[in-house]
From Swiss-Prot:
PANTHER family: TRNA SULFURTRANSFERASE. The lineage of its organism: Bacteria, Bacillati, Bacillota, Bacilli, Bacillales. Pfam families: ThiI, ThiI_fer, THUMP. Catalyzes the ATP-dependent transfer of a sulfur to tRNA to produce 4-thiouridine in position 8 of tRNAs, which functions as a near-UV photosensor. Also catalyzes the transfer of sulfur to the sulfur carrier protein ThiS, forming ThiS-thiocarboxylate. This is a step in the synthesis of thiazole, in the thiamine biosynthesis pathway. The sulfur is donated as persulfide by IscS. It catalyses: [ThiI sulfur-carrier protein]-S-sulfanyl-L-cysteine + a uridine in tRNA + 2 reduced [2Fe-2S]-[ferredoxin] + ATP + H(+) = [ThiI sulfur-carrier protein]-L-cysteine + a 4-thiouridine in tRNA + 2 oxidized [2Fe-2S]-[ferredoxin] + AMP + diphosphate; [ThiS sulfur-carrier protein]-C-terminal Gly-Gly-AMP + S-sulfanyl-L-cysteinyl-[cysteine desulfurase] + AH2 = [ThiS sulfur-carrier protein]-C-terminal-Gly-aminoethanethioate + L-cysteinyl-[cysteine desulfurase] + A + AMP + 2 H(+). This is Probable tRNA sulfurtransferase.
Length: 403
């Protein structure tokens, strides 16, 4: 069957009242970013639904791109015909023939918002249903649990027909809740935190700390690959790679071993917060899970958070490891995260880190070093890249041809 468009139904946007237009606009932007390598498609957003006009693009490829985009409740490959009963009959028959299985069942569900169409909803159901039955021998009607549900939507601009409804990712369009910086390590937890923040409409920019030669280029690439996984949900993720070697070496030399991790996290947070300010972000997201490691006790969080008044969002804070792993597997980040490349959170880790560090002592230890200058230097040398889901898909396809 040759579909000419995708019909997108909104999720929670239906509850957003006066802000609805803003949410629809943001969703349209995210859909457009996910289709950047498909210049022929056109996106048309309306108050209660959105259309992607395919113009010859592969509908199955478009379908795969739509599945992870937050803000979509469901979507359907569809065809549009003129406001003509005979055209509707022909399209309906073709759709059901394409979708049905032998000895299957079907129903017609029509909705007419354009009152000038000659048939009302019940008459459409009856006439189109009868026409399909007359032209297909191995098909029966089941109005309660059909194998194929033919949806017909009669509007002023035409009649839209579809037979499949595909569940979307739901949630809110990424960016509709503002921007935040995601502290993205190479571990399991932070990509999951980024995914959950995106689901609630937060546009994330990833911040990754890189400490060569202690951390390798493979570790850096792993973080970029994780950002690419997260880009599926918005179309694109900005990633900031922070050179952190000098700061970590100074911390190791100047700070007592038992609180190295606490001070390291404080410096990371200070850098991330300054990046947030420069990028007009509203919050910081991280993958901390309460009690999982020494730096994630309440006392440690208190000492680390003291460097900023910015809200810290911790989407996985109450989850145990198995719950986090399940989500990581679902979003296809787990296998990347467990690759054995050290990141800067694992180097210089003391054998017995303090789980209840005292803020006054931490600040005293830090006072003997000019961390301000080191932070400024790191900020001046940040590498920023844009990770785009469409470009990532193209690279995958190119490599696939080699094997």
């Amino acid at each position: 069957m040759e579909f000419d468009r995708m019909l997108i139904r909104y999720g929670e946007l239906s509850t957003k009242g006066k802000n609805r237009k803003q949410f629809v606009t943001k969703l349209a932007q995210n859909v457009k970013r996910a289709m950047t390598d498909l210049p022929e498609v056109r996106i048309h957003g309306e108050r209660d639904r959105m259309y992607i006009i395919l113009n010859g693009a592969d509908y199955q490829l478009v379908e795969e791109r739509l599945k992870p985009i937050f803000g979509i409740q469901s979507f359907s490959p569809a065809v549009r015909v003129n406001l003509d009963v005979e055209e509707v009959k022909a399209a309906a028959l073709a759709l059901v023939q394409d979708a049905h299985e032998e000895n299957g069942t079907f129903k017609v569900a029509a909705r007419r918002s354009h009152r000038e169409f000659p048939l009302d909803s019940n008459e459409i159901n009856q006439e189109i249903g009868a026409y399909v039955l007359q032209n297909m021998e191995d098909l029966t009607v089941n109005v309660k649990n059909p194998d194929v549900k033919l949806t017909i939507d009669v509007r002023k601009e035409g009649v839209f027909l579809s037979c499949r409804t595909i569940l979307g990712a739901a949630g809110l369009p990424v960016g509709s809740s503002g921007r935040a910086m995601l502290m993205l390590s190479g571990g399991i937890d932070s990509p999951v935190a980024g995914y959950l923040a995106q689901k609630r409409g937060v546009e994330i920019e990833a911040v990754h700390f890189h400490s060569p030669p202690y951390t390798s280029e493979q570790a850096k690439q792993k973080a970029v690959d994780l950002a690419a996984k997260l880009a599926k949900y918005s179309g694109q993720v900005q990633m900031h790679i922070v050179p952190f070697t000098e700061i970590q070496e100074v911390i190791k030399q100047q700070i007592p071993e038992s609180v190295i991790m606490t001070v390291t996290r404080r410096m990371m947070l200070r850098i991330t917060d300054e990046l947030r300010r420069r990028r007009n972000g509203l919050a910081i997201v991280n993958g901390e899970s309460l009690g999982q490691v020494a730096s994630q006790t309440l006392e440690s969080m208190l000492a680390i958070n003291a460097v900023t008044a910015t809200p810290i969002i911790r989407p996985v804070v109450s989850m145990d490891k198995n719950e986090i792993i399940q989500i990581a597997q679902k979003i296809d980040t787990y296998n990347l995260s467990v690759q054995p490349f050290e990141d800067c959170c694992t180097i210089f880790t003391p054998p017995s880190p303090k789980t209840k560090p005292k803020l006054d002592k931490i600040e005293h230890y830090e006072s003997f070093t000019d961390f301000e200058a080191l932070i400024a230097k790191a900020l001046d040398n940040i590498e920023t890249i844009s990770v785009n889901v469409a470009e990532t898909a193209q690279v995958k396809d190119e490599f696939a041809d080699l094997f």
